[in-house]
């Protein structure tokens, strides 16, 4: 019975125009972002061409202090403060007293008097604006050297006070700044990164991460349109009452529909991953190195599939509960806020938190990714379990509507009909 329901639901999904709209949008996004990788991001370093070496993450204490203090000075200059509790952005407004206290802390860390410190920050920021433009100056980190007498322990104590002022989830938490900061790579470091890309990641590992990054953006919003349309289609076709009287249990009906839609939605993702895999294999043959032909499968099934599951589960629950396209609005707000927050925390830092859309926009950074892999795993398990909870709630709502309960729109229509007849 269940397998028959599953096959019928797959067939219905395949006949749906909105499904092919989903496939078209997904593949269009894929081809515009990764259709032609080019493989320029990982070229063999040439000695003497420092501009081509790229960046590496440094956890040197001096680098951590000067860049963290620079971020603090930059925030003071723009008077813009944001934190990321639970992975979501929160804008903080500070009082004049709190900002003055932060100025004093920064002065103690740099050993500069208040006026000298303010003048130094103003001069460097204005100079960057003139040289790079406002946006580039904003993105370019300010560097403030710590005082010669400032120890790392004292620096940490000062940052703890900053965290008390701003609240949880700021850039000044130990767990944040000790992840390190990007610095220009040396030739030796660039060669190490290149060899890791070829022989540890085997080329496909790096591009699988990039694939997950790009496809995750689209999959954070597109599935909800298919789910909502499929759920509302029966109401528009006047089939709701017939469906509610089926002999199959509510759990089987809901589960078969949910699984069939997720199965159909993951298929184009798999096809797109094969396309990139074959491109990587062709590139590897030219370099005479081997590739990992299974590198994309963990990304598709462990990174992207849980995202589809939670988006579809939320869409089914809200649509069954409200009998309206409310889920599109809710998912749209969540998706937009999450993508924006994820971009602000860095595109390849491994700071996954509780983000729906996981960002790691780099074919390199293998070690950084591995260092944060447990965080990614916890994130995807959390959303998988949340999807299961929403699925159970959907079954409950569906079952109650089968019994004629919770049909708020039907009751409203009946009330209006009785009122018009009176």
Task: List each language-model region with its residue ranges.
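Terminal transmembrane helical anchor/hairpin motif
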Residues: 36-132, 192-199, 203, 326, ...
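Aromatic- and glycine-rich beta-strand/loop motifs that create alpha-glucan
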Residues: 1-26, 403-414
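Helix-loop-helix units of permease transmembrane domains in multi-pass membrane transporters
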Residues: 4-9, 14, 215, 228-267
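Cytoplasmic juxtamembrane interface segments
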Residues: 138-153, 231-243, 307-331
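Secretory targeting signals
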Residues: 25-86, 90, 161-222, 255-324
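Transport-system extracytoplasmic interface segments
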Residues: 104-208
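Hydrophobic alpha-helical transmembrane segments
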Residues: 20-23, 297-302, 328-331, 380-381
